[in-house]
């Protein structure tokens, strides 16, 4: 039986957050990088799917938080979640990526101040 990747929920959450922020922050970031063209306006076509991406972000980060902060007693002996240094590193990575996802998901509201 194959072991699941413990980082999958975090990686999936960040990818979903990128999808949620692509319609709003995407054109702004591309313009900051010097990329231009009329096709950039097509990124707003993803706006109707934004709530789905946001729900996906919440679900994946909720699952990741549950996996990262579950009690040590629930971990099998010898696995990485039972090692204190690995647990601490995963918690830091979880919060850094959650903050990144929050910035991307809320970009629809704050990007207007910079554009």
From Swiss-Prot:
Membrane topology: Multi-pass membrane protein
Annotated Hg(2+) binding sites: 23-24, 75, 81
TM region positions: 10-30, 45-65, 92-112
One function term, GO molecular function aspect: mercury ion transmembrane transporter activity
Domain of life of the source: Bacteria
Alphabetical UniProt keywords: Cell inner membrane, Cell membrane, Membrane, Mercuric resistance, Mercury, Metal-binding, Plasmid, Transmembrane, Transmembrane helix, Transport
GO CC, one annotated term: plasma membrane
Subcellular location: Cell inner membrane
Family label: Belongs to the MerT family.
Cited function: Involved in mercury resistance. Probably transfers a mercuric ion from the periplasmic Hg(2+)-binding protein MerP to the cytoplasmic mercuric reductase MerA.
Record-given protein name: Mercuric transport protein MerT
Lineage of the species this protein comes from: Bacteria, Pseudomonadati, Pseudomonadota, Gammaproteobacteria, Alteromonadales
């Amino acid at each position: 039986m194959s072991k699941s990747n413990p980082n999958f929920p975090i990686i999936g959450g960040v990818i979903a957050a990128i999808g949620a922020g692509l319609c709003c922050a995407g054109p702004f970031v591309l313009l900051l990088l010097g990329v231009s063209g009329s096709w950039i306006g097509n990124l707003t076509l993803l706006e109707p799917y934004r709530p789905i991406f946001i729900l996906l972000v919440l679900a994946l980060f909720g699952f990741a938080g549950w996996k990262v902060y579950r009690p040590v007693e629930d971990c099998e002996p010898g696995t990485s979640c039972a090692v204190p240094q690995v647990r601490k590193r995963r918690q830091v990575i979880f919060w850094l990526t959650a903050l990144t996802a929050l910035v991307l998901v809320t970009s629809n509201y704050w990007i207007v101040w910079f554009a």
